[in-house]
Regions:
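Bacterial N-terminal signal peptides that target proteins for export
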Residues: 1-10
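Hydrophobic helical h-region of N-terminal Sec-dependent signal peptides
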Residues: 9-17
């Protein structure tokens, strides 16, 4: 799993403040729109179902967006797309963070020690959107380390509703194995397509 420092995550919040302070003398519909969604060809489709056509972008944000399947984006909605659908807009992409996407694991298909490993992890946020269950997580790492950290969501058998367990394999890079002067916190976004598992319109879910 590629980790992203807290500084990078905070970038979106900083840009949002700048956008809110901008003087709205143009025809821009909205500044500082923050949303998660999927990349579809050269467009971005938000979890709310809006289609964003990237007509302007900062730096390499657009190129980086096209290299991923799912992302958390900060953009300015400039205008409705001429001749487009009712939910289609031209936007300026200001920042983006890649979102890791993984299928949900069942113990019937996977039951290895690596999958079941439960090293400490801090779930800072969890929400449902776009057919996914999304997490923002943090965990300890050694500064400059390239040690891979693996995240999985395991579906467990239950007679009442659905029960899921988020697991973390730190590959030995845990708090007790990191010198105190080399310890930092890293984290990132991860999404699991829960609509592949839950088909009911209403369901009881525990994580």
């Amino acid at each position: 799993m590629k980790i992203t420092s807290r500084i990078s995550i905070c970038l979106a919040a900083g840009l949002l403040c700048l956008g809110a302070a901008s003087c709205k003398k143009d025809t821009t519909i909205q500044y500082g729109n923050i949303t998660m969604g999927n990349v579809d060809g050269s467009t971005f489709v938000s979890d709310q179902g809006n289609i964003f056509n990237i007509v302007e972008h900062e730096g390499n944000t657009y190129e980086d967006l096209l290299k991923t399947e799912r992302a958390y984006t900060l953009c300015d909605i400039l205008s409705k797309t001429a001749g487009g659908q009712d939910n289609e807009y031209d936007v300026r992409l200001n920042a983006m963070v890649k979102v890791l996407t993984k299928d949900i694991v069942t113990l019937e298909t996977e039951k290895t020690e690596d999958i079941l490993k439960e090293d400490p992890i801090d779930i800072r946020n969890c929400w449902f959107s776009g057919g996914y269950i999304n997490f923002y997580i943090e965990f300890p790492v050694k500064q400059g380390s390239q040690t891979p950290h693996t995240i999985n969501l395991i579906q467990q058998e239950t007679e009442n509703g659905y029960l899921f367990r988020l697991t973390h394999n730190a590959s030995g890079e845990t708090m007790e194995n990191i010198p105190s002067n080399q310890f930092i916190t890293a984290g990132g976004y991860v999404s699991f397509p829960i609509n592949k598992v839950i088909k009911e319109k209403e369901a009881k879910v525990k994580v």
